[in-house]
Amino acid sequence: MRPPVRASLGLLVAWAIGACVCAAAIETTWKHASAGDEVRLFALPAARPGAPPAKVVWELDPMAACGSLRPSWVSLRPPGQVLDTVVDAECVSEPVLLAAWYERRDGGSEVPAPFWGPDGAPPQRGNVTNGTLVLREARVGDSGMHVLSVFHPPNATAARHVVFLKVAPRRPEPAGGTPPPRDDEEGGTEEPATPAPPPHPHPIAEVAHVRGVTVSLRTQTAILFAPGDTVHTDVSVMPIAHDDDPYVMEVVWVRFDVPEECGEMRIYEPCLYHPQLPECRSPADAPCAASVWTERLAVRRYGPCSRGVPPPRCPSDAAMESRAGLGWYGHTVNLQLRDASEASGGLYVCVVYVNGHVHAWGHVVISTASRYRNAVVERSPPRYRPPPVEPTPSAQPTGPRPAAPRAARLVGVLGAAVGLAVAGLSVWACVTCRRARAWRAVKRRDLMAPTYIRLADDELYGDLSSYGDSDDSEYDSDSDRLPGTDPAPKRGSGFQILSGAKADPWSAGARQHGHLITFRADDTSRYRDPSSPDPPHRR
């Protein structure tokens, strides 16, 4: 195919996909066929009298990887429901443009004569018979979603007709028998030789949103400017409430710098929903990764809103970081950069929160042409970069650190030992001081003071006895007194008080009397206390 033809075909494919999204009317049917059958797909609409030629597009979306498809009830605008099919976008192959043409009349006939394909060549197995688009010699590869879009100028509203076609391999017919009859259904569609399931089996339960809020966000992905220009974003946010519960919607703008050393910026979508992940906080490809932001550039808040009063009709407020040239573009959720410079450029991400949860997001790169970097969306989390280890292995202690409870017990034991030692020293000091005072008191005793040396010979308290009338006793004689002693008092305690000099038996005065009885020197140790060398003092 020539390059201009390829370009035209690419435009037609994009135009056909857009038609599938923006169609005004949708009609969906299901057909089953066997390989080699002729399948009547669409009945071409009649031309409008006096209307410009309509544009017709026939495309095929292969769905061989989607498994078995069946009808289901889908809630597009609750509580209304339509019978349709829910298909995972990941299993749908690239659309194939089968034909596209403008209607034209032959001899004033109201039946359109199609002008096949961009190069005027009709498809090999497609044909229009009596106003019906027919697929001849169906194959297993023709299974999928066939879409016929008819655009009527001048407003280019499209009517879409969708047929889910399932082509099964033909089974060999039994020998010697007649094949089962084929019933024409839906305009003569031929059924396979074997009985096929009904075109409308029992629909499954609802699979679309029936509660909550669905948010649709559309934006361009790049804005180029020259220094000094005034530019603004073009983001469209459309919330659809599926119930009457109130909700709060926040449109948050964040900005990431685009370093010159980065070949491209990577946006990790899981980090928008789970910013607390360790790999999001420390990505391996930082600073070329847009994973977690620390501050919000601008926020516009709507709420409380409801299905009857959606944004922007519900109450709203806005907040924005103070930056030169940054402002809101009117009363919308878009940003405006006045007198933009290279410092104003960067990766801008718009995130829509509903009741604190992420519901939609988009991004746009605002930059000059010389510093433009592409942004790539990654569906998986980034690789984790461990934080650097600050201390070196040699600086770490070799042995294990003692546990805190063991250290506390050791401190307690040492404290108790010190306390016992202090108490013992205190007791020892007190005893030593007491003994020293007692010894000093004995050393200071005056030997000349009166001292008791012996008991009296008379009966103690003799004046109170029955013999108290007698003046003298047989024991009161001068011969019984020690030399140098005074006679004992007649009516006293019975003790003899001696002077210091006289009381000493070994003194010179006592030795003058020959009848003094003394103890031998070798016997004195038996009668004296060795621990008390001095005589007892006066009581």
UniProtKB/Swiss-Prot annotation:
Q: What is its main location?
A: virion
Virion surface compartment: which residues? Answer: 25-410
Q: Where is this motif: Internalization motif?
A: 452-455
Keywords of the record? Disulfide bond, Glycoprotein, Host cell junction, Host cell membrane, Host endosome, Host Golgi apparatus, Host membrane, Membrane, Signal, Transmembrane, Transmembrane helix, Viral envelope protein, Virion
Question: Which cysteines in this chain are paired by disulphide bridges?
Answer: 262-288, 271-280, 305-314
Under the heading SUPFAM superfamilies, the entry gives: Immunoglobulin
Q: Where is the signal peptide?
A: 1-24
| Membrane-spanning residues | 411-431
Region annotation Interaction with gI: where it falls in the sequence: 66-91
Composition bias of kind Basic and acidic residues appears in 520-531
Those parts of the protein on the Intravirion side are: 432-539
According to its UniProt record, where is this protein located?
A: Virion membrane; Host cell membrane; Host cell junction; Host Golgi apparatus membrane
- Acetylation found in the keyword field: no
- After translation, how is this protein modified? Phosphorylated on serines within the acidic cluster. Phosphorylation determines whether endocytosed viral gE traffics to the trans-Golgi network or recycles to the cell membrane.
Membrane topology term reads:
Single-pass type I membrane protein; Single-pass membrane protein
List the residue ranges of the region (Disordered): 168-203, 378-404, 466-497, 517-539
InterPro entries (UniProt xref): Herpes_gE_N (IPR046463), Herpes_glycopE_Fc (IPR003404), Ig-like_dom_sf (IPR036179), Ig-like_fold (IPR013783)
Quaternary structure, from the entry: Interacts with gI.
Q: What does this protein do?
A: In epithelial cells, the heterodimer gE/gI is required for the cell-to-cell spread of the virus, by sorting nascent virions to cell junctions. Once the virus reaches the cell junctions, virus particles can spread to adjacent cells extremely rapidly through interactions with cellular receptors that accumulate at these junctions. Implicated in basolateral spread in polarized cells. In neuronal cells, gE/gI is essential for the anterograde spread of the infection throughout the host nervous system.
Q: Which family does it belong to?
A: Belongs to the alphaherpesvirinae glycoprotein E family.
Protein name, UniProt field: Envelope glycoprotein E
